[in-house]
Regions:
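Individual transmembrane alpha-helix segments
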Residues: 73-107, 235
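Alpha-helical transmembrane segments of multi-pass integral membrane proteins
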Residues: 30, 135-137, 194-215, 273
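A juxtamembrane structural motif centered on a specific transmembrane helix
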Residues: 173-196, 309-332
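Interfacial helix-loop-helix junctions of multi-pass membrane proteins
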Residues: 40-52, 138-161, 215-230, 279-303
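N-terminal signal-anchor transmembrane alpha helix
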Residues: 20-58, 204-210
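Membrane-interfacial loop-to-transmembrane alpha-helix junctions, especially the N-terminal start
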Residues: 22-24, 123-133, 192-200, 259-271, ...
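Hydrophobic cores of alpha-helical transmembrane segments in multi-pass inner/ER membrane proteins
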Residues: 105-110, 164-179, 238-249, 301-317
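Membrane-interfacial catalytic/cofactor-binding modules of polytopic membrane enzymes
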Residues: 205-243, 247-255
Length: 332
């Protein structure tokens, strides 16, 4: 029985859809583990901890001491005309663990895509989102290789982060297809608020990119110089613009005449994440620019972009197709 672009799924398939949702959110979580690992690598300046790719010093399992490497290893593993960095086991293993987590996330993606193709390939949208994930993951892996090959070129590092955001949103969209919801027609104020929310999401993305650029300045110029730059003051002041936009959208979600259960939850989480991110940024500016706070700041930025996207999605897709809340998929 079709209802717009939705189609009721037989009751016998409900357990499979619940498994699909859990698997999609598992992959989503694995991507964020990779974000934490990648952020740690960046904070430790361990991006060249393994100077070659996909091996590490030509080995599948990296060494634990410099004595295990050939005497000319810095020349042998030179990158972009530069000698390899002196061996540091902490940096090497941080980068290696980052790569291992990426492989685990890749295996999760294969399981997700295989499950979709095996059980749900007739549902076009869920198939599209699931199939797009490995394509984006391959691009992400190639970018990782280029980041190493170019000795951490800043524009590639930033692009690498953007692809991570794309991957997490694609995983969320696979999970979102398993809810028994259809899009409501947005008119008047509701349409205006929805568009305002998307503008807030774009501004949040700009803020995350400003932060990524500022982190690179800290690395290249030092903390004191970077924190005295115009970019720092723009980044700090712009955070209040983002908070204002999102706080207003959050309030409008709660004031909407339609009871938006999912949108309210995700909007609340987003508000908490953004405010926490501003608080962490203040700690970094005035008290401590330590690695822990930098990783947390980056993680909060990417998490808030995901949860804000979810809130905007469920602001529109908020009507249950059946009062029983049965599971449905998009078929077109």
């Amino acid at each position: 029985v079709k209802e717009g672009f939705m189609s009721q799924v037989p009751e016998t398939e409900w357990p499979r859809m619940r498994r699909l949702r859990h698997l999609a959110f598992l992959v989503w979580g694995l991507f964020f583990l990779v974000v934490v690992a990648g952020g740690t690598v960046r904070v430790l300046e361990a991006g060249m901890g393994c100077p070659d790719w996909p091996t590490c010093y030509g080995l599948l399992i990296p060494p634990t001491s410099e004595a295990q490497l050939p005497p000319d290893y810095r020349v042998r593993f030179a990158v972009a005309g530069r000698l390899a960095e002196p061996f540091d086991p902490l940096k090497t293993w941080a980068e290696y663990i980052n790569r291992l987590l990426t492989v685990v996330a890749g295996l999760g993606v294969l399981a997700l895509v295989g499950y979709v193709w095996l059980r749900f390939r007739r549902y076009k949208r869920v198939l599209l989102y699931a199939t797009a994930i490995p394509a984006a993951l391959v691009a992400e892996a190639l970018l990782g290789w280029q980041v190493v090959a170019t000795y951490l070129a800043q524009h590639l590092v930033t692009l690498h982060m953007i692809f991570t955001l794309v991957l997490t949103i694609l995983a969320f969209m696979v999970a979102a297809q398993t809810y028994a919801l259809r899009g409501r027609e947005l008119r008047g104020n509701s349409l205006w608020y929805w568009r305002l929310g998307w503008l807030g999401w774009v501004l949040l993305g700009v803020q995350v990119l400003l932060g990524a650029t500022l982190r690179s300045w800290v690395r290249d110029l030092g903390v004191e110089t970077a924190l005295e730059s115009v970019l720092f003051y723009v980044h700090r002041s712009f955070s209040w613009v983002v908070v204002g936009f999102w706080a207003y959208f959050h309030w409008r979600v709660y004031m909407d005449p339609v009871r938006l259960r999912f949108a309210r939850r995700w909007a609340m989480v987003t508000t908490i994440l953004i405010v926490t991110q501003v608080f962490v940024g203040a700690i970094m500016s005035y008290f401590s620019f330590s690695g822990f706070w930098k990783v947390l700041h980056l993680l909060l930025g990417l998490l808030s972009m995901n949860t804000a996207y979810a809130a905007l999605y469920f602001y529109k897709y908020s009507e249950y197709v059946h009062a029983s809340g049965s599971y449905v998929f998009r078929v077109a």
